[in-house]
Amino acid sequence: MTDLRFRTYTGVSKVVGPLMVLDGVEGIGYGEIAEITLPGGEVRIGQVLETTTTRAMVQVFRGTRDLDTEKTQVRFRGEPMKISLSSDMLGRTFDGSARPIDGGGPVIPECIRDIYGSPINPSAREHPRDSIQTGISSIDGMNTLVRGQKLPIFSGAGLPHNLLASQIARQAKVTGQAEKFAVVFAAMGITYEESAFFIREFEESGALERTVLFLNLADDPAIERIITPRLALTTAEYLAFDKGMHVLVVLTDLTNYCEALREIAAAREEVPGRRGYPGYIYTDLASLYERAGRIRGREGSITQIPILTMPDDDITHPVPDLTGYITEGQIVLSRDLHRKGIYPPVDVLPCLSRLMQGGIGPGRTRADHAEVKNQLYSAYARGIRLKSLVAVMGEEGLTPLDKLYIRFCDRFENDFIRQASYEDRSFDDTLTLAWDLLSILPKAELKRISTEFIKMYYHGEEILECKGP
């Protein structure tokens, strides 16, 4: 019996880049999935981007190369794009269209979901709380990641954001709930070398067992990058809200995703916005970022770390600029620190985690965490200002206290920010190291820390006696 939802047409009116246009069609819905069969028998998947009463424009996820406009058959399936979901996806590796590439069989679905998901009702959202430990001091100590938060990393071409992304995904953990934690990692527009690096990192560290990998390669059709993050987020929603897991979603590189959006907009001859990006890029990015969060009455959570490269290191570029309006802070990587050989090159001064206060303190990290963080920011900022002054005027006018701040600044970069790519520091390790650095300064300078904590952790006299000013 023929399924009336399926309508098949032969021939394509026009092909433009990754898009094809069909005329003479009826009853086609926006977002509907199409099966495109080439004359040689190859089947590709497409999705309706635009429709009228007699015309449909379809984006083809594997590209339009070798597509015959006369003999190609297009079957519309009458439903949006969906993904088969199962808890058995943990430990598996998929391409950017959710096809297995690890040699394993297809996923036996426990359920099938629309990849565009359902928006979380604002009244049902629960405020993000409790932390995720990444093992990286510049994040855990200064910009703590909170469950349910979306905290992007702003990087630049040539900076080690891929290494940082793999380290976060390997080391991230929820204290005391290891069995309920999972990572969904989606990479868009990466090279074969980068793909092999991610797979090797997860396999050798054993982190693959709790990870779902989606890898879209640079030579895959750019149009596929539109669906890769949505496949990842739908998987995360299933693990979080159906299975009660705390899920960390790492998306890299969102700039490649936005380039794919720009390519589609150009093919559709849309009026361009800033720098040629479509005018709806803000809304489109929000449809990804706002899928993070917690739902009242549900155990799980979705935390996002989107990673994007800033063209020419320009933080006012539309992609990082609009991302900053939607997300709850940012981690900024510094080319100056990278030139000094410091990894990870996190420039803590422009960094911010707006929800940090909900994830630190007694019973979560440590009671002194907030005050230590504030004092570190203050001391490091003063050290940076003094180093800028020294570069212009020399060290002759510096007081002994100024020299202590410069010493603190150097130690902060080399001991606190710098760490090995396989060095996993606990919150306690990070805060203990912070007190070692703050003890370089006189006790009277720690004006942002209460006397109670200074009595408990400060040991400046011993350090000054051993090492001098």
UniProtKB/Swiss-Prot annotation:
InterPro entries: ATP-synt_VA_C, ATPase_F1/V1/A1_a/bsu_N, ATPase_F1/V1/A1_a/bsu_nucl-bd, P-loop_NTPase, V-ATPase_su_B/beta. GO terms for cellular component: plasma membrane. CDD domains: ATP-synt_V_A-type_beta_C, ATP-synt_V_A-type_beta_N, V_A-ATPase_B. SUPFAM superfamilies: P-loop containing nucleoside triphosphate hydrolases. It is found in: Cell membrane. It comes from the Archaea. Pfam families: ATP-synt_ab, ATP-synt_ab_N, ATP-synt_VA_C. One of its GO terms (biological process) is proton motive force-driven plasma membrane ATP synthesis. One of its GO terms (molecular function) is ATP binding. Keywords: ATP synthesis, Cell membrane, Hydrogen ion transport, Ion transport, Membrane, Transport. It is a peripheral membrane protein. PANTHER family: V-TYPE PROTON ATPASE SUBUNIT B. NCBIfam families: PRK04196.1. Belongs to the ATPase alpha/beta chains family. Has multiple subunits with at least A(3), B(3), C, D, E, F, H, I and proteolipid K(x). Component of the A-type ATP synthase that produces ATP from ADP in the presence of a proton gradient across the membrane. The B chain is a regulatory subunit. This is A-type ATP synthase subunit B 3.
